[in-house]
């Protein structure tokens, strides 16, 4: 009896230690108030590991950096928690219809918009590249609606982030290692998510085959509905009983019909002979008495929904900006201006040109770098740039260097003419996802010769590696 008592006490102590460890783990993950994980689906537990690993590291470093990066990280964290709630729902409930599914995804979609809007509202931020990296890739949270290839979709978003994280690395690699660690932590979220999707949701979000149809998100850290699916809707009322009289009538009519059919040719004996004076095409007088001929019923067409025309929302015009903010020249929202000039520049200053339309800008002196973003029909003339000139998300841009520039980068741009000076003939032209690019080389007579930048390539496997060459289209 004493041995049994000792065994019970040892078991109780062991259980107590396990509960303490479990509680500490939950507190560490920040989900102590979330539903119990004892019965959580394996892919929910795996997602929790992702939250406790790279996500927690990203949040920690973002908090150390502070400012806009920390605020942005908190928004990302909210989006990930909403995604976890959807995973809990999917693990317990069946997939709803398409229109209901969009309602379930709405909170995640709204959070994605909030993250993107934060970047747009803080274009003057000193940490704008950090915000852009997050904003360009946060749509990866939408993988839950992507089928049958959610994994490649996340990779595409991750690649979009790297365009800006490379800038962060270039700016901080010799200045502050904390920002380098931030880049590694943030990108690891999406690489880990790709591995997670490959293991649990290869062709799309895996829904439960049993349980009620999902109606709302469950598994949120707080809220009365956390951890359980909504109760199933009540069954539809039974159809009204069919009248026995109508049943007997239909049965009798059907029997009569088959009886007449079974008569064979003898059924024609009951038909009356129609003489010529009874035929309308033989007797015009009878045709005149018969009145207008009725047309048959029109084929069914679904009624068009009557929608009241919604008034067009007046787009708010942003104020034009031309100012020096710290070490950044901001040129924004300029339209139909042909004489903009920036003078008194310094080597450490940069220029950011955003949303300018049909505008010409001249930058005098030597400057660190120039970025042209989301501009149309922009003419840019500058003297010297020691770093890089970047053209992003723009259309019909003309750039002329009077002095020297080492690199011109063209990304997601349709129509770009780069006029080089004699001192810039060794300039590197780097392009991606762009079209109608031309480089103009000066001649001895003062004119320019135009050379198109290749847009079409051919790639072959030579047995050891891929070899890519330019493909020329024969005209």
UniProtKB/Swiss-Prot annotation:
There is a cross-link at residue 348 (Glycyl lysine isopeptide (Lys-Gly) (interchain with G-Cter in SUMO1)). The keyword Phosphoprotein applies. The modification Phosphothreonine is found at residue 307. It is found in: Cell membrane. Keywords: Acetylation, Actin-binding, Cell membrane, Isopeptide bond, Membrane, Methylation, Phosphoprotein, Ubl conjugation. It comes from Homo sapiens (Human). One of its GO terms (cellular component) is plasma membrane. This is Adenylyl cyclase-associated protein 1. The modification Phosphotyrosine is found at residue 31. The modification Phosphoserine is found at residues 34, 290, 295, 301, 308, 310. Residues 216-237, 278-319 are annotated as: Disordered. Directly regulates filament dynamics and has been implicated in a number of complex developmental and morphological processes, including mRNA localization and the establishment of cell polarity. The gene is CAP1. It is a peripheral membrane protein. One of its GO terms (biological process) is modification of postsynaptic actin cytoskeleton. Homodimer. Binds actin monomers. Belongs to the CAP family. The modification N6-methyllysine is found at residue 287.
